[in-house]
Amino acid sequence: MPWIQLKLNTTGSQAEDLSDALVESGAVSVTFQDTHDNPVFEPLPGETLLWGDTDVIGLYDAETDMAEVVAMLEQHPLLGAGFRHKIEQLEDKDWEREWMDNFHPMRFGQRLWICPSWRDVPDPDAVNVMLDPGLAFGTGTHPTTALCLQWLDGLDLAGKTIIDFGCGSGILAIAALKLGAARAIGIDIDPQAIQASRDNAQRNGVSERLELYLPKDQPADLLADVVVANILAGPLRELAPLIGCLPKSGGHLGLSGVLATQAASVAQAYEDKFTLDPVAEREEWCRITGQRK
């Protein structure tokens, strides 16, 4: 069905109040958008950061009388008569099809493809991971996931054990298993990620070789030939004493979820235990890799 969108601009501190006003005026949903498209990379747990210049966008049923909506909003003390806003009609689309059309098979390195289930596999003889976008992070579209997949594709994983620390969708652990690893261990703080990883592993026929744990449940003596952690710079620094002990002597470590500007501080947290490689970059993100001394 078609919709009507009303957009107004405000400050981050007033956005929540105006969101409530839009809901009271009949909006079925309200979203916040940075006016200048500046991303927020790493909010603290439980924190919702808003930009200094924020667009508040309300979505209304197509039958809504928008003149009445505007008149109601003009009574709000933060808006007043003649407040600046933009109203536009959104065309009726098959939104599920529109969403699906944005995802295509993607190649990483020489052997590895990540394919959504509704697409044909481009190369049946390649290493193909079937993965659909879901609640947990990791489909290959983000530069950090792509950097990690390329790295895994370049390793000799035959018969190896891998730990995917912060496994999200399980994409890295599953890719490693499909690339020849004998065993993979996924760890995540989010139970939804554990379930998503389990479902994706079953879809790819590798569930019997994938172990999944919440941090409180993981074995104390975990060691692996390869450890990959695609999380964020802050946790990578804070958890360096833990993550750095997971690779065996001579084992490989791959870290991402790190902005290029954060690479030096993250690398510093691991350089005592690892011989580090040159940093790999993609867009504004990077990957730090090394071998356990």
Curated annotation (Swiss-Prot):
Major enzyme class: transferase
GO cellular component entries: cytosol
Subcellular location: Cytoplasm
UniProt GO BP: methylation
Record field: catalytic activity: L-lysyl-[protein] + 3 S-adenosyl-L-methionine = N(6),N(6),N(6)-trimethyl-L-lysyl-[protein] + 3 S-adenosyl-L-homocysteine + 3 H(+)
Principal location: cytoplasm
EC number: 2.1.1.-
Residues given in the record as S-adenosyl-L-methionine binding sites: 145, 166, 188, 230
Keyword Methyltransferase: yes
CDD domains hit by this protein: AdoMet_MTases
A molecular-function term among this protein's GO annotations: protein-lysine N-methyltransferase activity
Key words of the record: Cytoplasm, Methyltransferase, S-adenosyl-L-methionine, Transferase
Family per similarity comment: Belongs to the methyltransferase superfamily. PrmA family.
PANTHER family tied to this protein: ELECTRON TRANSFER FLAVOPROTEIN BETA SUBUNIT LYSINE METHYLTRANSFERASE
Record function comment: Methylates ribosomal protein L11.
Protein name: Ribosomal protein L11 methyltransferase
Protein's organism: Serratia proteamaculans (strain 568)
